[in-house]
Amino acid sequence: MNLYLDETVELGSDGNRGNLLGIQPYMLAADYASEETFFEKIDGYLNAARQKAWLNPCTVAVLPEYLGSWLVILGEKAQAHQAKTINRAMRPIVLRNALPFIQELLSSREGNKVNASIFRMKATQMAQAYQAVFSKLAVKYGVTIVGGSILLPAPSAQGGVIKPGKGALYNVSAVFKPDGQAHPALSVKSFPIATELPFVASGLTGNLPVFETPAGRLGVLVCADSFYPQAYEQMKSLKAELIAVPSFSMGKGLWNQPWGDYSGAEAPADVDPADAGRLTEGEAWHKYALLGRIASAGVKHGVNVFLHGELWDLEAENSPSIMMNGQSWFESIATRGALLNLWL
């Protein structure tokens, strides 16, 4: 199993208070062919961290946004993961599941009925694999895992198990305890971006939870949520001590291109309108996302990781970042796989 692990970074020293472990996996579409291949890939990164003595009962491992969403091709024919584009990958899925797809399509109320119907008809299988893999990994390594995010309809965590429901699709992140159970609360993305809005519903910022972990009180802000002051106000009100930001941004070379402003919702009042087009994408993340806003929540430690890989035509080159006691740190955008360890 090739991890494409180009970078391992350690910040601080072990003070027996635990650590935030940012895992930036380099995923291939074939990694989603089965539950076993998905498990093996993520297991490889955790095993690499264990070999560096970076895992302990107070470790919180953080994985990127949409990591679980591509389980939509789970169990499908090789055409799905061998396709050159995401649209072509979806075609054999629709053909093989024609009846449930049509049923979902007829009842869909989303603007993008096709995307919504595909994810909704595969939701049970996706949720089961997501739960099984991260539960098993949390137990195997005895750590807390922020399982990136996954698209599911009306999801909930019942008895430590993630279950899809009937209703709108949400982009959610689950936190798995060292005993393998999912925390009863889910972090639901409050600010889907423009490309998500046609089929992904918005959560409420006021419902964002904080998770009790052995390393401290953890807040999880899914990608674009980290750009909005309301999210940090919620974290402050719940006395968060750590913040994790699972992210995914599409576009090769995007990080160094001019920033296109806020997407999917109005820019907050504290944003300089002139920054759109003046800042690069990377500079905007530095100024307006985790690194620029975490202090407003009274939080000193945070990590932001992005999904990298060869996933059809969904190319991404973005830089993971860490905040440690008010000091920010960026990794190179050229990195494929990376482990970023922040001792608390």
What annotation goes with each model-predicted range?
Residues 116-126, 190-196, 218, 276:
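Surface-exposed cleft-lining segments at the edges of enzyme active sites
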Residues 15-35, 62, 186-189, 216-225, ...:
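Active-site-proximal beta-strand elements of phosphoester/diester hydrolases
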Residues 132-146, 164, 223-340:
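CN hydrolase (nitrilase-like) catalytic-core segments centered on the catalytic cysteine
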